[in-house]
Amino acid sequence: MVLSIRSQIIIGVVSSILLTSTILAIAYILMWFNGHMTLTLTLTTIITSCLTLLICSIFINPLIQKIKQFNIKTKQFANGNYASNDKTFNSPKEIYELNQSFNKMASEITQQMNQIKSEQQEKTELIQNLAHDLKTPLASIISYSEGLRDGIITKDHEIKESYDILIKQANRLSTLFDDMTHIITLNTGKTYPPELIQLDQLLVSILQPYEQRIKHENRTLEVNFCNEIDAFYQYRTPLERILTNLLDNALKFSNVGSRIDINISENEDQDTIDIAISDEGIGIIPELQERIFERTFRVENSRNTKTGGSGLGLYIANELAQQNNAKISVSSDIDVGTTMTVTLHKLDITS
């Protein structure tokens, strides 16, 4: 049986009275005291003990009430009520310190619970928005497959080129699923080896799968090298993915028949390269230009509800850039267009 504080105090006081009375009775039997003195001492002990019990009750009642309130608070928290409780216990010191420790623990648990809920929601939205990055390679595979099936593509070099594109897009899908797994599981520690990159050849391989779409949509796409750029070392796989996602974004949020420019320049120190992809699309309002790289930010918030999709492509591009010695910046004007610039730092493999 668990006794309350009040019961324990009463038992203690009663036990003290009984013990004292027993000692006085023994003293009387042994004739250490006469009857009158023994009675006086016994009554004095009882009265003093009762007064002690009364005084203790006066001081102990507020403490008991605080303990009861604290108990209610812990039960509410245990039942999942994580709402902040500003109830303050200033005294006694032990109760105050216990309350402070509990509040700190409760705050940390609440933050962790909120973080877990947020991460679960983000992962759910991430899976729901997976179609965003699947559309372009799947559309390319379907388009070239139908062209081969229907006999639209007949020349030998066109057939070979179509097969090359199909293989490339299938590989891109495989890479996409790898990256999706990386995002869902947070950090997998995946790294890429540095490779020697000839930028013009890299851009040709990236732009080739878009050739039919650009012709079909009557678009103009121009690549401009502001200066001659020698081969340099960078992480080829993530760089291809970054540029592909940015190009997908430019095509998606600009009108058919519009122009897309890719401008490449090298800084004077020849240690960084800027690749700017500009469209004549709908633009992004300034206050949302930073948020477009967030994992769960939906692009229709800042652009057009008719476009659908999500900001997953930009999120992946930005994450890959940060992890692989690059940076993406954005500038945009509403109804004028958007420019996404990838700044690459050349890798010094000798160090």
Swiss-Prot record:
On this chain, the residues bearing Phosphohistidine are H132
* A single cellular component GO annotation: plasma membrane
Post-translational modification comment from the UniProt entry = Autophosphorylated.
Task: Indicate where this protein is primarily found.
Answer: membrane
A Pfam short name: HATPase_c
Know the name of this protein? Histidine protein kinase SaeS
SMART domains hit by this protein: HATPase_c (SM00387), HisKA (SM00388)
Keyword Transmembrane helix present in the record's keywords: the answer is yes
Q: Write the Enzyme Commission number(s) for this entry.
A: 2.7.13.3
The gene name on file is saeS
Q: How is this protein positioned relative to the membrane?
A: Multi-pass membrane protein
Q: Which GO terms describe its biological process?
A: osmosensory signaling via phosphorelay pathway
Per the UniProt record, which residue ranges are transmembrane?
9-29, 40-60
Annotated ranges, domain Histidine kinase: 129-348
